[in-house]
Amino acid sequence: MQVLYKSTRGKGETVTASMAILKGLSEDGGLFVPTEIPKLNVPVEKLAQMTYQETAYEVMSRFLTDFTEDELKNCIANAYDEKFDTKEIAPLHEADGAYFLELFHGATIAFKDMALSILPHLMTTAARKNHVSNDIGILTATSGDTGKAALAGFADVPGTKIIVFYPKHGVSPIQEKQMVTQKGDNTYVVGITGNFDDAQTAVKKMFNDQALAAELNEAGFQFSSANSINIGRLVPQIVYYVYAYSRLVGKGTVKAGEKINVVVPTGNFGNILAAYYAKQMGLPINKLICASNENKVLFDFFSTGTYDRKRDFILTTSPSMDILISSNLERLIYRLTGENAEKCAELMQALSEGGEYTITEDMKKGLADFYGNYCSEAETKEAIHSVYKNSDYVIDPHTAVADGVYRKYLADTDDHTTTVIASTASPYKFTRSVMEAVEDETESMDDFALADKLSEISGVKIPKAVEEIRTAPVLHDTVVDAPDMPAAVKKILNIVRD
C-alpha cells in the first residue's frame, strides 16, 4: 500500500513521503498528513522480540512507502547507534506506580533526539531520490530542545545549512549553552528578543514567502524544516510508543491486546500526536493524557472546545512547553473535521486573524480519546520532590508536569490502567529547577555545580552532553528582533551582504 501526503488545508498537491519531508510545509500553509493511517499488523509477541531499530523499520516503512528497504534501514542504522548511551535507545523505568519512557538517552539528552537523529538521513536520502540539486536550508524555531537536537543532527551534513532561532530569555542556561557552543561549519544559532511563538510564526511566514523562495532558489537553496511540522519528525516518534508497549508485553506487565494509558507533557502537540497516530495504527491505547504547564491553552481547548491564544505568555520551569500556538494540533483538527480540509483551513484562518476558534459538537466527540489537565509551577516542583522521595528517581520539570497531571487523572477517574509517562528530557538539562525541588541549599551554586550535586544524590553519571559544554567556547552570539529574522536568514545564506 502506498501512503501519500496531502495538506491539512487542501489546496497543495498530494506528494510522496520523501517530497513531504523535503518540503516540510505545504505551499498552502497547511501541514502534510498521510492520506490514510496504515495498520501495524505485526503480532505484539513478535514486536517484543525486536530491537529498537527493527521496531523502527516495522513502523516507519508503513508510512514512508517510497523509501526502499535498504534506504530506510540505512537511515535507521545511522540514526540509532552509539550516539545513544543505551542499547535499548528508549528504556522504560518503573517508578512511583508508572512506567517512565526515557526518551533522553541521545546526543542532546532530550526526546527530540529520537526523531532528529534520523531526520537528516531521511532528508538527504529524499533529496537524492527527488534529484534535488539545491542545498537545503533548514529553518527551525526552538523553545529549547529541538534547536540543539537539530543542530547536532545536521552538523556538517553535506548539502545542508541549519539556522536555529530561539527566545533569548526563554530557555534554561544549559539549553542555551548547548546551542551557542555548537560546532559545525553549516550551523547557525540566532537568539530573538521575542518568545517561541514569535519565532515559530516568523519561520512559518518565511516558508510561505514566494518572493523569498525565488531569491533562495536563485542562490541555490530551498527551505525545509526540522520542526515537528515536518512529517519526517513525526513518523519516527510513533516508534517509541510501539516499542514501549512491546516491552511491557515482553516483560509480562500487560497481556497482548491489553490497553495502556499514555501521558505526554505537551507544548507543540507533536509528541502526543505521534501517540494518537500509534493508536490509530492499532496500538492498544486507552487514554491519551495531555499534560500542560501554566500555558494551559490545550487544557482549555480540551475542556471547552475553544482554542484561544489571546492570553499572557508565561515563562515556566518547563520552557519547552511554553507555547500558545500549538502547531501540530492542526493535524488532529483535520482528523476531527472528518478530513475536511476546507473546514480545517477556515479554523486555522480564524486562529491567525482573530486569535481563536471553536470546534463543533460533532468534532468534540473525537476528543474522547484524550484527557487534558495542567500543573502549576508549585505542583511541578512538588511532583519532582514526590517522585524522588518515593522512588529515588529524579525527573525533569517537563516529565514532572506529566506526572502531576497523571496524579490528577487518577484522582478524577480512579483508572489504574498500566500507564506510560513520556519522560522527555534528562534532569541534567534543568539542574536548577530539579535541585531546588529536591534539596534546600542551591542558591549559591552555578548550573554545573548543581549538576555535580545532582549526580551525587541520584547516583546517575553526568551525561556527556553536559560535560562537553562545561568549558566549551561560545561560537554563536547573534541576537535579532523577530521582524528581522528574514534578513538574518538572507545574510547567513549569503543572499545579501553587509
Question: Where are these predicted regions, by residue range?
Answer:
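PLP-dependent amino-acid enzyme catalytic core
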Residues: M1-D498
